[in-house]
Swiss-Prot record:
Protein name: Cytochrome c oxidase subunit 5b-2, mitochondrial
Keyword terms: Membrane, Metal-binding, Mitochondrion, Mitochondrion inner membrane, Transit peptide, Zinc
Classification via InterPro entries: Cyt_c_oxidase_su5b, Cyt_c_oxidase_su5b_sf
Name of encoding gene: COX5B-2
Subcellular location(s) of the protein: Mitochondrion inner membrane
Family: Belongs to the cytochrome c oxidase subunit 5B (TC 3.D.4.11) family.
Function: This protein is one of the nuclear-coded polypeptide chains of cytochrome c oxidase, the terminal oxidase in mitochondrial electron transport.
């Protein structure tokens, strides 16, 4: 429930930061607070504290927001998602890669948080489709699908390192 409340109002909070005129900021804050308070009757009492926190925080400053300002109890992946939304990024963009058929000169780029990722190749479109072929895609190496000859390349957009969190040098 918290995620729904936060994600639906992150855009209005970020709009406060992008609005330069004080009157514009006041209007956005008022509309944010109004939309939060109209939902308060359908949300348990503890979330009204949360809505007041968002409304008052947005009214006080139009500076960069931190996740702790919006949702202090967020941790782990949820905190990363909220931080990315506050910065205007979408972490889900790396989950469903789409694009043109990868060639040797221009491989299909797959984004990953780590130096390795499991990828599935469904082939091209129409008659070029095939059963999904699963493989490990590694940083710095391209991979050619053995069925459709599509090429893939990994782009690391996160902290890097192995996906299990353990380095090879700890043995």
């Amino acid at each position: 429930m918290w995620r729904r409340i936060v994600s639906s109002h992150l855009k209005s909070i970020s709009a406060v930061g992008s609005c330069a005129a004080p009157s514009c900021r006041h209007a956005v804050v008022e509309s944010t607070h109004l939309s939060l308070s109209t939902r308060a009757s359908s949300i348990p009492a503890y979330s009204s504290i949360f809505s007041r926190l968002i409304g008052s925080a947005a009214a006080d400053t139009a500076v960069k927001k931190r996740v702790e300002d919006v949702m202090p109890i967020a941790t782990g992946h949820e905190k990363e998602e909220l931080q990315a939304e506050l910065e205007g990024r979408k972490l889900d963009d790396i989950d469903f890669p789409e694009g043109p058929f990868g060639t040797k000169e221009a491989p299909a780029v797959v984004k990953s948080y780590y130096d390795m990722r499991i990828v599935g190749c469904p082939g091209g479109e129409g008659e070029d489709e095939h059963d999904v072929v699963w493989f490990w895609l590694e940083k710095g190496k391209s991979f050619e699908c053995p069925v459709c000859t599509q090429y893939f390349k990994l782009e690391v957009v996160g902290p890097g390192g192995p996906p299990d969190g353990h380095g090879d040098d700890h043995h």
